[in-house]
Every structure is written in C-alpha cells, then in structure tokens.
Curated annotation (Swiss-Prot):
It comes from Acaryochloris marina (strain MBIC 11017). Belongs to the bacterial ribosomal protein bL35 family. Gene3D superfamilies: 4.10.410.60. It comes from the Bacteria. This is Large ribosomal subunit protein bL35.
Length: 65
C-alpha cells in the first residue's frame, strides 16, 4: 500500500502538542494593528488549541503527525 501524503499547507499551519492536541495561531494579527490595543495583540500572539470538530480534519490531512 502506498504512503499517505501529508498536506503541506496544513503541516505549515498546525503543530502537534505533547499531549496530542493540534495547536494553531490566532487570526487578526497580520495587519491593521494600529487601532488594536496591546493587551489584545498580546492575546492574539499566543497559540491556541484546534477545536475537537476541526481536529478530525487536521488529523486526516497530517497522517504521520
């Protein structure tokens, strides 16, 4: 049976944590940052966990992670 391919776009966006959950960056932190407060920008800089509903799709896109 041939190897499964990893979707490279997903591999660049998601990382697996030590406990097996997928981590992702938060949105709204690329541009138009002048009017956003420092607390908000700090909060948006942190990583967060992918929801359980989406984790199934991410797992299918990255079979070897």
């Amino acid at each position: 049976m041939p190897k499964l391919k990893t979707r490279r776009s997903a591999a660049k966006r998601f990382k697996r944590s030590g406990s097996g959950k997928f981590m992702r960056r938060k949105a709204y932190k690329n541009h138009l940052l002048e009017h956003k407060g420092p607390d908000r920008k700090s909060r948006l800089s942190k990583k967060c966990v992918v929801s359980e509903q989406d984790a199934e799709n991410v797992r299918a896109m990255m079979p070897y992670s």
